[in-house]
């Protein structure tokens, strides 16, 4: 039908811009995996602590299936609520030091459902320009007036507050804690100060901070010592926690309100028993000890120090640049989408899977590297050698 002819043309445009994407089959979640038939060292996983392959999570998931079955069978407000959901929510709240928490079936649903429940067309959203797509889409769906401020630019944010805050009923400040395509952290203490000064709510997305940052791995809020601030703390169960799902932690009134007004929680099937149990086991493991986080940060430091030397910014001929990072996400910026695709393929030819990230996902093309606690030092060394060879040939 002619009504669908535009799709082929749109795909051709995507191909021409070097923006085309396709899925790759990965055999397992570990640091070494088989990718489309090739054994590779995996530097693309968000499984920062290596828990997705941990036998303790698998045993917890199997036990939950034996007790509750494979599915939750309904929405949480109807037939889909299980005691294990409550146990996970209590564990998250204790870990995050909030009054309570609510678990969603994915992090994406948590962001969309929370934002659209809190603000509407009478309200204002001020958001970091580098926020995750789920935050951006939640903002659009809310109908609120949206203004983005330059990445981590609190001066620009304050100017927007001075200009627009008084014209709207409510204001929601929205930010990632760890920016997933850059690896840097939000200026949380400054954001909290502005939220208090201008009577704003503040939502912080801890997707890539949960399990990784802070003394107990509770995230960026703990890392900055801001646990006493009144915040809306969102996070995922699918990255460092090695399972699936999302959560929001905060005051009892906030969570009670979300149970009654958050459409993406009300009108979807509850998180499966297996995923819930695996996430609960992960929270307990992370809270009980810091060994995995210590291993992770050793590997991050090893790679960062080497790349800082090999990708020296003072080299005028160097086309690869290590972007600032305070997390297990390290990004090597390259000049064009074509260049980053070539570099990623060269790494793959050497058995290194580090994906090319291109516009429109990010403003500039880059190789995105994710470090896991289960990576061995020798695997980090292999990556360093491979990146150095790519840099020399670029």
UniProtKB/Swiss-Prot annotation:
Binding, substrate: 21, 132, 361
Cofactor(s) the protein requires to work: pyridoxal 5'-phosphate
Matches recorded under SUPFAM superfamilies: PLP-dependent transferases
Binding residue positions for pyridoxal 5'-phosphate: 107-108, 180, 205-208, 236-239
UniProt entry tagged with the keyword Transferase: yes
Keywords associated with the record: Biotin biosynthesis, Pyridoxal phosphate, Transferase
EC number(s) reported in the record: 2.3.1.47
GO biological process: biotin biosynthetic process
Catalysed transformations (reactions): 6-carboxyhexanoyl-[ACP] + L-alanine + H(+) = (8S)-8-amino-7-oxononanoate + holo-[ACP] + CO2
Molecular-function GO term, any one: pyridoxal phosphate binding
Name of the top EC class for this enzyme: transferase
Keyword Transferase carried by entry: yes
Pathway: Cofactor biosynthesis; biotin biosynthesis
In-chain residues carrying the UniProt-annotated modification N6-(pyridoxal phosphate)lysine: 239
Pfam families in the record: Aminotran_1_2 (PF00155)
Function: Catalyzes the decarboxylative condensation of pimeloyl-[acyl-carrier protein] and L-alanine to produce 8-amino-7-oxononanoate (AON), [acyl-carrier protein], and carbon dioxide.
Family: Belongs to the class-II pyridoxal-phosphate-dependent aminotransferase family. BioF subfamily.
Binding partners and assembly: Homodimer.
PANTHER family on file: 8-AMINO-7-OXONONANOATE SYNTHASE, CLASS II AMINOTRANSFERASE/8-AMINO-7-OXONONANOATE SYNTHASE
Listed name of the protein: Putative 8-amino-7-oxononanoate synthase
UniProt organism field: Acaryochloris marina (strain MBIC 11017)
Lineage: Bacteria, Bacillati, Cyanobacteriota, Cyanophyceae, Acaryochloridales
